[in-house]
Amino acid sequence: MSASGEALTTRDYIGGHLNNLQLDLRTFELVNPHAENTPSFWVLNIDSLFFSVLMGLLFLWIFRKVAVKATSGVPGKFQTAVEMVIGFVDSSVRDMYHGKSKVIAPLALTVFVWVLLMNALDLLPIDFIPYIGEHILGLPALRIVPTADVSITLSMAIGVFILILFYSIKMKGVKGFTKELTLQPFNHPVFIPINLILEGVSLLSKPVSLGLRLFGNMYAGELIFILIAGLLPWWSQWLLSLPWAIFHILIITLQAFIFMVLTIVYLSMASEEH
């Protein structure tokens, strides 16, 4: 949501909110987004990394606090809410994962709550944290929604992809996994190159689609908040930003759920023995 009051052009305002706080790994200096810089691969979006780690620590703190204070009697409201989330994730895993791993349910819970917390940062006033970063901390730029950064979402998706490969090889063996890539869908040695291309593309599309789906939805949601704040007068922004924020609560929850579901489904497919 917006708290905008800066005397900026619309173009500068919108562009300023789309810049990450970047560290140039070649010089270990902060990148000035307002200067003419040559695009480089060797930069690190340290704001996205910071807020993603912060939300991860918040997740651990919340669940540890509930675990320490959990009672067998009548639970409090906070404990009840956490238990509802755990029960919801556990039932989802039981319905979708048909293997025997004890890691999948904790992984699904971590993915769901972590992504949900990162998505929820999009509900903070769009100018509040960047204003603190620029005027109090003296930072050249600051974005607070990690899931609106494609490097974060693709990094998480790559982590899931590594688990897919691990469970595929664990359950089927190296030989079975190789056969799956080379002898499907056409079970003849002549078609091995075609099978390898088809199965390779199918396998690689999983992390790409997983990461880009989350990024695209969250980036679009963040951009709408920025456009509302940048194009409308301050006294009329609430007419659109408040309804969109209410609707966005559904979006951030749904995207966290979809990321969790696809993670479970992909790992379930990888764990199937053929």
Swiss-Prot record:
<dbReference type="InterPro" id="IPR045082">
    <property type="entry name" value="ATP_syn_F0_a_bact/chloroplast"/>
</dbReference>
<feature type="transmembrane region" description="Helical">
    <location>
        <begin position="245"/>
        <end position="265"/>
    </location>
</feature>
<protein>
    <recommendedName>
        <fullName>ATP synthase subunit a</fullName>
    </recommendedName>
</protein>
<comment type="similarity">
    <text>Belongs to the ATPase A chain family.</text>
</comment>
<feature type="transmembrane region" description="Helical">
    <location>
        <begin position="43"/>
        <end position="63"/>
    </location>
</feature>
<feature type="transmembrane region" description="Helical">
    <location>
        <begin position="149"/>
        <end position="169"/>
    </location>
</feature>
<keyword id="KW-0812">Transmembrane</keyword>
<keyword id="KW-1003">Cell membrane</keyword>
<dbReference type="GO" id="GO:0005886">
    <property type="term" value="C:plasma membrane"/>
</dbReference>
<dbReference type="InterPro" id="IPR000568">
    <property type="entry name" value="ATP_synth_F0_asu"/>
</dbReference>
<keyword id="KW-0997">Cell inner membrane</keyword>
<dbReference type="InterPro" id="IPR035908">
    <property type="entry name" value="F0_ATP_A_sf"/>
</dbReference>
<comment type="function">
    <text>Key component of the proton channel; it plays a direct role in the translocation of protons across the membrane.</text>
</comment>
<keyword id="KW-0138">CF(0)</keyword>
<keyword id="KW-0472">Membrane</keyword>
<keyword id="KW-0066">ATP synthesis</keyword>
<keyword id="KW-1133">Transmembrane helix</keyword>
<dbReference type="GO" id="GO:0042777">
    <property type="term" value="P:proton motive force-driven plasma membrane ATP synthesis"/>
</dbReference>
<keyword id="KW-0406">Ion transport</keyword>
<keyword id="KW-0813">Transport</keyword>
<dbReference type="Pfam" id="PF00119">
    <property type="entry name" value="ATP-synt_A"/>
</dbReference>
<keyword id="KW-0375">Hydrogen ion transport</keyword>
<feature type="transmembrane region" description="Helical">
    <location>
        <begin position="103"/>
        <end position="123"/>
    </location>
</feature>
<dbReference type="GO" id="GO:0045259">
    <property type="term" value="C:proton-transporting ATP synthase complex"/>
</dbReference>
<dbReference type="InterPro" id="IPR023011">
    <property type="entry name" value="ATP_synth_F0_asu_AS"/>
</dbReference>
<feature type="transmembrane region" description="Helical">
    <location>
        <begin position="223"/>
        <end position="243"/>
    </location>
</feature>
<dbReference type="GO" id="GO:0046933">
    <property type="term" value="F:proton-transporting ATP synthase activity, rotational mechanism"/>
</dbReference>
<comment type="subunit">
    <text>F-type ATPases have 2 components, CF(1) - the catalytic core - and CF(0) - the membrane proton channel. CF(1) has five subunits: alpha(3), beta(3), gamma(1), delta(1), epsilon(1). CF(0) has three main subunits: a(1), b(2) and c(9-12). The alpha and beta chains form an alternating ring which encloses part of the gamma chain. CF(1) is attached to CF(0) by a central stalk formed by the gamma and epsilon chains, while a peripheral stalk is formed by the delta and b chains.</text>
</comment>
